[in-house]
Each structure stands twice: as C-alpha cells, then as structure tokens.
C-alpha cells in the first residue's frame, strides 16, 4: 500500500520540480519581478529586424538579442547612450553607453564601455542571436543606470566590432536600432 501511494505521488513531485526550473537546461526560473526593458529593432526603412531584452539580475544586466533580415556574417551589437532611433542612420542614438568613462573594446587596455557586447553571427537566413551579461549594470538607479534621463538604445552595426578601436570598434554603419523601454 505504501509503495502504491509513493508511485502515485511521484508524478506530482516531478511536475512540481519542473515548474521551478526554466526550459534552459534546468537553470532556476527567472524572477518575474526582476526589472526588464525591451526594444523592437527596426531597419532604416522601418522594417522589423528583431528584438532585444535586458533584465536586471544580481550579477548585472542580462541582454538577449534576436535578429532577422541581416546580411550573413558578423555584426557588432552595442547599447548606445541615447534612447533615440531616428532613421535612416540612427546617429541620434549617440555613442556607446559608457557611464564609467572607459575606452572602447574588450581588447583595449583602457576599455571597455559598458555598452560593448560580443559580435553576433547572422546565419545564411539572416537571423542571429546574442546573449551577454553586463557586469555591474542596472536598469534604474545606482552608479551605472542604463535608463538615465535620455534613455538608451540597442544598435546592430553593418560589420563586426574589432574590440579595440576607439570609439566604436570600426563596426561600420548602424543598420538596426531599437529604443529600450519598460512594458
């Protein structure tokens, strides 16, 4: 009788355990109350190029970018310091988000900007994904807020970032942009 009760309770225990993890290999589920902002990425002609999500966690800002319609190959992805994406060239987004006053690039001995992130590879279908953690960043408040008075934007560039050339890594033109906002 005890064995039958245990066997009947086992599926419920497995189900409860599954609810406490995400679908990404058993990692803890994301905190639904964690601050989050997102951006719809658009090309200069207004066509959709994907989305970006930034979530605040204990170790910094978790950035996820999903892109489409890109030229196959490497593309720089940066967070820019102004929440403005005026087409067609998106220069209204300003320079890279750099609240700490560093130089550009992970390979620069004086780097790196907080908005510097790894290059994204777009496949033959023009789609690409990139995930990165910005250590010490916050969405609001603290010494390094992403959303200051003039906001912030995510920008995809035409070429790869060389990770050292100041101020922008020789990444070429801005081909997609999205203003980060809550909601």
Question: What function would you assign to each model-found segment?
Answer:
Residues 1-7:
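Positively charged n-region of N-terminal signal peptides that target proteins for export
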Residues 7-17:
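Bacterial N-terminal signal peptides
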Residues 3, 17-74, 79-183:
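N-terminal leader/targeting pre-sequences
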């Amino acid at each position: 009788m005890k064995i039958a009760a245990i066997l009947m309770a086992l599926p419920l225990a497995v189900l409860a355990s599954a609810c406490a993890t995400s679908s990404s290999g058993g990692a803890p589920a994301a905190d639904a109350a964690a601050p989050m902002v997102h951006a719809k990425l658009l090309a200069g002609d207004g066509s959709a190029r994907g989305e970006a999500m930034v979530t605040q966690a204990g170790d910094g800002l978790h950035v996820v970018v999903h892109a489409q319609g890109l030229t196959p190959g490497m593309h720089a992805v940066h967070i820019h310091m102004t929440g403005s994406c005026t087409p067609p060239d998106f220069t209204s987004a300003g320079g890279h988000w750099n609240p700490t006053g560093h130089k550009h690039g992970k390979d620069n001995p004086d780097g790196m900007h907080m908005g510097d992130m790894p290059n994204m590879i777009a496949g033959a279908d023009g789609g690409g994904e990139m995930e990165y953690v910005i250590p010490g960043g916050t969405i609001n408040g603290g010494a390094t807020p992403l959303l200051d008075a003039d906001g912030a934007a995510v920008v995809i560039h035409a070429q790869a970032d060389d990770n050292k050339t100041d101020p922008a890594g020789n990444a070429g033109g801005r081909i997609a942009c999205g203003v980060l906002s809550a909601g």
